[in-house]
Structure formats: structure tokens, C-alpha cells
């Protein structure tokens, strides 16, 4: 009789142990210290119990490096997984073009978005301040690749043809800046073949020997996976930093940022603060747990999992907010403005552009 009563208890204990072994790796705590659990309050059916105090946030992220840092947040703070103690849930969508993200912000279908840096500045001016800059999430990820061994410095690009994508955005302005600062006129000293997609640049690079292309991660990793003869000739972030080292107020190359609708930020400051803490923890998790993060990144089609596995350590994923964010962004946008005022929307953003909690 006693054995009959003990059997259900033993089975229950085994089930609990089994369930605990299947939980995902935990993200770093939002304070950067001990880990925080991603488990949620559940009913007897296993479905997360409803929490009337949870504020839903709609998030749009750009595929590629700009969206990578949000992968953990997108999975474990989704409405069906949100922890019981979280004041927010996050419903996310991945887009392939900046214009898709800004359209979602415009019509209120997205509250927060991860987009290219200069796109954020342009959109701010175009919409009379309808968004605010919340954080920097991606630093420089641009590289000059070569199927050969002739490019050892920026000077070696003179007279060459460079395949590139991203005309009118960060890639064009970054390339033009480092070329110009090295005494190379982008309009006459080199030939830049602008392609509509990174995949076209990759195809051109693969086609014949001594081809040169500018590519961002994770396409750099993809290229080197396809051919052992393709090498990284120049790191544009390093070239940028070398130029800026002599400046009175050095800037750095900033590829991606997180922005929020100004109205939403003003109405829900506590929710925005919670989101930023979760985002910080997500970035820490992605950088510290490459294998697990690569699977999440692939699951959400931000970057293919097998590529993300190798590329994540090179994607320069960060979380920078507040004064440090403003300093890095204002310096970077100033460099773009000096090249072409239209690149940042015709004027540098005012202080209201930069959110600080």
C-alpha cells in the first residue's frame, strides 16, 4: 500500500527534474550580475498565466547584424513566454528593409525598432521628431574583401573596382569617408559598382580572381565559407578609428541603433526602461552564448543559424545608452553631415533626439 502511494510521487519528481533539465541557458541579469530565470508563471495546463499588468510592446528589427542582439529578447519575452515578473511582453517582426521598419513606426504597428543609424536620423527629421534614439546596438561591421592578395592598405584601392551594396546608407558614407581621408576620390580614383543586394556583391566576388567587394558581416563569413581564397583585406572600422584618432572629439563607426516612437516613450517611461534592461541582457546573452544564440537568430530568420554560428563573434553587437550613446552617435552623424547633409536628413538631430532615462 505504501509503495502504491509513493509511486505517483516518484513519477512527479522525475517529471520535474526532466523539465528543469530542458530549460534554455539563462541570460545575464539585467544588472550584469547573477543570472535571471526566463521561466514564466503557468497554469496547470502549462500555458503562461495571464498578467493584466503586462504592457505589450511591438518590436520591428532589421535582419542582419542590427537585429541579432534582440534574439533572446524576442524569444523569451514573447507573450507566450514572458516571465511572471516582467512588466512588458514583446511581439516582434523581422524585416529586410529599413523602409519596412520605418513604415511600421509611422502607422503605429511598431513601438520600437532596430534600424540603420542614418535612417533613424533621416526619419527623425522627416517626421518632425516622431522617434527618439534609445540605444546603439551595432558598431562597425563593414570589411573590404578580396579574392587575391593585392590589397594591403587603403592606398592599394586606387584604380580598382569595388563591388558594394547600400548606396544612400551607412555603407556608402563609410566607404566614401575612409577613401577621401586617405586621399582617394570615390568619384574618380576608384570605380564603385553599386548592387541592390549583398548577395550580388558576393556573387561578383566569387566569379573571378582579384575581385574586390565591400561586405558586412555575416556576408563576410558566408564568403569565406564558400571559398578559402577570399580574405579580409581591410577592416573599415579600424580604418575609421585610425583616421579619427587625431580628431579633437573622436567618433566611431555606428551601424545600427534602437529607436522608439516619441509618443510611446513619453506615455510609458517605465515600460521603456524595462525594455532597455531586457535588451541589455539579451545582448549580453547573445555575446556570451554563441551556440545557443545562433539557433535563435536562425529561428527568427535574422541570420541563417549556420552562418551566425561563425559570424556572431565578429558582428560587433553592443548595448550603449545615455550620455555614451549620444557622444558616439553625435560624432558619427557629424562626420556623415560633413560629407553630405542629406545623409542625416539635412541637419544634425537636436538634443531631443537622444533619449536618456
Question: Where do the language-model regions lie?
Answer:
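Pocket-lining segment of extracytoplasmic ligand-binding domains
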Residues: 118-119, 200-296
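Conserved C-terminal helix/tail region of periplasmic/extracytoplasmic solute-binding proteins
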Residues: 330-357
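Sec-dependent N-terminal signal peptides of Gram-positive bacterial secreted proteins and lipoproteins
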Residues: 3-25
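Short, glycine-/small- and polar/acidic-enriched structural segments
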Residues: 32-33, 46-194, 211, 217, ...
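Secondary-structure end/capping motifs
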Residues: 265-339
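Short, solvent-exposed loop/beta-turn-alpha elements that line the ligand-binding surface or hinge
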Residues: 78-88, 238-251, 317-326
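Bacterial lipoprotein signal-peptidase II cleavage site
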Residues: 21-34, 38
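Short, surface-exposed acidic
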Residues: 186-190, 301-313, 343-350
Amino acid at each position: 500500500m505504501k509503495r502504491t502511494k509513493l509511486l505517483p510521487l516518484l513519477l512527479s519528481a522525475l517529471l520535474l527534474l526532466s523539465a528543469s533539465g530542458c530549460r534554455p541557458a539563462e541570460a545575464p541579469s539585467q544588472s550584469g550580475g547573477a543570472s535571471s530565470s526566463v521561466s514564466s508563471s503557468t497554469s496547470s495546463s502549462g500555458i503562461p498565466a495571464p498578467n493584466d499588468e503586462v504592457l505589450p510592446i511591438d518590436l520591428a528589427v532589421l535582419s542582419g547584424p542590427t537585429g541579432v542582439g534582440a534574439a533572446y529578447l524576442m524569444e523569451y519575452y514573447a507573450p507566450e513566454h514572458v516571465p511572471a515578473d516582467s512588466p512588458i511582453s514583446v511581439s516582434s517582426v523581422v524585416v529586410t528593409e529599413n523602409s519596412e521598419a520605418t513604415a511600421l513606426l509611422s502607422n503605429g504597428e511598431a513601438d520600437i525598432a532596430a534600424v540603420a543609424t542614418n535612417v533613424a536620423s533621416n526619419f527623425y527629421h522627416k517626421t518632425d521628431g516622431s522617434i527618439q534614439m534609445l540605444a546603439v546596438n551595432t558598431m562597425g561591421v563593414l570589411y573590404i574583401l578580396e579574392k587575391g592578395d593585392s590589397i594591403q592598405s587603403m592606398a592599394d584601392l586606387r584604380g580598382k573596382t569595388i563591388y558594394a551594396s547600400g548606396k544612400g546608407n551607412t555603407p556608402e558614407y563609410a566607404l566614401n569617408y575612409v577613401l577621401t581621408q586617405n586621399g582617394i576620390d570615390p568619384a574618380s580614383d576608384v570605380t564603385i559598382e553599386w548592387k541592390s543586394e549583398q548577395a550580388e556583391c558576393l556573387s561578383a566576388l566569387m566569379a573571378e580572381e582579384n575581385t574586390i567587394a565591400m561586405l558586412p558581416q555575416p556576408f563576410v563569413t558566408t564568403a569565406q565559407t564558400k571559398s578559402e581564397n577570399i580574405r579580409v583585406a581591410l577592416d573599415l572600422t579600424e580604418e575609421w578609428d585610425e583616421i579619427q584618432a587625431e580628431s579633437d572629439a573622436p567618433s566611431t563607426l555606428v551601424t545600427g541603433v534602437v529607436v522608439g516612437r516619441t509618443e510611446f516613450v513619453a506615455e510609458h517611461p517605465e515600460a521603456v526602461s524595462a525594455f532597455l534592461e531586457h535588451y541589455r541582457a539579451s545582448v549580453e546573452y547573445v555575446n556570451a552564448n554563441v551556440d545557443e544564440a545562433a539557433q535563435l537568430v536562425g529561428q527568427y530568420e535574422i541570420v541563417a543559424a549556420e552562418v551566425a554560428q561563425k559570424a556572431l563573434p565578429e558582428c560587433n553587437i553592443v548595448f550603449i545608452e545615455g550620455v555614451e550613446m549620444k557622444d558616439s552617435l553625435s560624432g558619427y552623424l557629424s562626420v556623415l553631415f560633413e560629407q553630405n547633409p542629406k545623409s542625416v536628413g539635412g541637419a544634425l538631430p537636436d538634443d531631443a533626439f537622444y533619449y536618456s532615462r
